[in-house]
Amino acid sequence: MEMLETMETDNSMSIRELNEKMSNDPDLSAVNLDVLTSNGFEPFVLEFPNAEKRSVWEATFKDAKITLAKHLTAAPSWSLKTIIAHQTRPGLQLCTATVVPGKRVDSTPFLWVCASDKFSGQVAVMALDSGEITIETCSAIGNAAVTAMCTVPPPTRPRKRKIKSQKSLEQLQKESIMDINSSGSDTESSSDEGTSTAGQTTVWIGNDDGEVFVVNSTERIRSRTRDRLARLRNSVTSMCAANGNVLVATSYSNQVQLLLFRPASDGGWDLENPQTVGHVCQAPITNMQQIGKRVIIASGNSLHAFFMDTGKFQPPVEILPSSDVITLMNVTGQYVFLSGRKSTEIYVVDVFELSVLNHFNVTSFVRSQLSGREHILREHKMGCLRVSCLTVARHHLWIGTSAGFVLSTSIQAAKSNPTPDLRGLRSRNVKLINEMVSVCEIGHSGPCRILLPVQTPTHSNNPSRKQKRSSLNVPTQQSSQLMLVSCGEGLDDGTATQDPSTDAINHLIFWKFS
């Protein structure tokens, strides 16, 4: 009996010593994580008081990770909001679009859509109110094809104030009050004049003649297009707002130029003296997008990374075959999605290493969608099939095709699966009375040329009096709703009821996510 008690005591002492050793062991009470930042993956260490708390946290973290992965791969639910028929002059094709924020933070944004041919451009401004979406204005701009457009936030300018230490607190308070009042009057006067870009969001529109129009987001395009204009030597191929500046790429023959426009001293933009950025791009720059401190640049079949803070380039990497050119690109998080000219292949690239992670083809899905159509229509659409636009929304990659179909797949599947599960964009209307689901597929009869996600604010219908008076309860009064805009030629609902005469009319389909 004494021997058993001695053994039990020794075992309990051993367990206690082992627990103390595990609690004091830094390897068992710490978790090493790789955190994704704007500069890539960086190590991060979490330390816990003991190994037990570390194991509990690790189990909870793994469960949350599995739940998040299931949420990211699940197909988002959406419904058809409205369809806008954008009647333009014959020959004009939709070429680019951008989302422009409203006058206030909680205001509804606007959608600027450009249509163009070889000799002219046209800009339509659409109001995205909570009710009906309407076309506010439609104006001509320039005498050449519109090639690029981007929304540029107002330039930031640090205010320099020299304060002498001998001044009293009352004097400093009076000066600060005067500064606030004077700055407010300046803002009001500038907004009233409408001829200055100081402190206002602007829309930059470039065309084939090398003209860059800088238009205030709150003014009429027709009356102000010639007030702020930069004339460049070569055709504009791409534009991008990055780190308070604007990058504009131009090209002619084998001359490729990258220009950097900076804010002016008056709070506007210096359009007369752009800075030339040295680069190694051998082909025209077709796309530029900012991610963190870098700008990803597509030139020819290669990707370049330009660091805005240092002005240096990462060595370029060839992504496509030498005979192909990158024409479509979308950058989000850790991944770059791109496609070549007249190609049905989509490549997934790591944004930091610029290495190809995966690539897949959309031909088989489009062929299955066209299986019930007429033979001549099926042969025509399959013969000229290509990926026409790309965007990312709700953790999914959205793909527009020349056949008019809009496809989607989760980013998780796109980055690793050579044959990801592609779905068609559709409107689902649930009939609760009959307990049935009716599905109506809608696309374009011609190419889908633009896909653009739009975030619109939604306000609380019945906020309490306390919420109304509190300035810290903005999230309780305001939330956002995501819409996906599909812009293309004609309308196709999967039946033979549509009028063929509307196939040449540009249509915008607004899908609302729930």
Model-derived regions: residue spans:
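Canonical pleckstrin homology
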Residues: M1-L72, Q200-T202, N301
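Long intrinsically disordered, low-complexity regions that are acidic and Ser/Thr-rich
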Residues: M1-N24, I163-D192, T401-G404
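WD40-like beta-propeller blades
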Residues: F41, F48, E52-R54, E58-Q93, ...
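Beta-strand-rich domains and repeat architectures in extracellular enzymes and scaffolds
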Residues: H86-Q122, A144-A148, G184-W204, D208-D209, ...
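Short coil/turn segments that connect the beta-strands within blades of beta-propeller domains
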Residues: T108-P109, Q200-T201, G244-N245, G292-K293, ...
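Structural core positions within WD40/WD-like beta-propeller blades
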Residues: W112, W204, L247-A249, I296, ...
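Structural signature of WD-repeat beta-propellers
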Residues: A115-K118, N207-D208, T250-S253, A298-N301, ...
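Blade-level signature of beta-propeller repeat domains, shared across WD40, Kelch, NHL, RCC1
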Residues: A403-V406, S410-Q412, P447-P463, Q477-S514
